[in-house]
UniProtKB/Swiss-Prot annotation:
It comes from the Eukaryota. Belongs to the DEFL family. It is found in: Secreted. Residues 1-24 form the signal peptide. This is Putative defensin-like protein 158. It holds the Pfam family SLR1-BP. Its main location: secreted. One of its GO terms (cellular component) is extracellular region.
């Protein structure tokens, strides 16, 4: 048993160094909101509004192919 190869040692170190996330973490909770749905999306304004209002990331996303895109803000709840 004293003769452990280097690869076995590395595998054991990898197994024991894994950190598991708890189920109670709030870091995985993201919310989305449509900012001003009546106006077409301008990417610069969308990102700025989302960042300043919600500290999130704004993207212009169309709900269907033929529709004008809306500003969708994704932020940490």
């Amino acid at each position: 048993m004293a003769n452990i190869s280097w690869s076995h040692f590395l595998i054991l170190m990898l197994v024991f160094s894994v950190v598991k996330k708890g189920k109670g973490d709030q870091t995985d909770k993201y919310c989305t909101i449509i900012i001003d749905p009546r106006t077409p999306c301008d990417l610069v304004d969308c990102r700025l509004s989302c960042y300043t209002g919600y500290n999130g990331v704004g993207k212009c996303i169309a709900s269907k192919a033929s529709r004008t895109p809306n500003c969708v803000c994704t932020y940490n709840c």
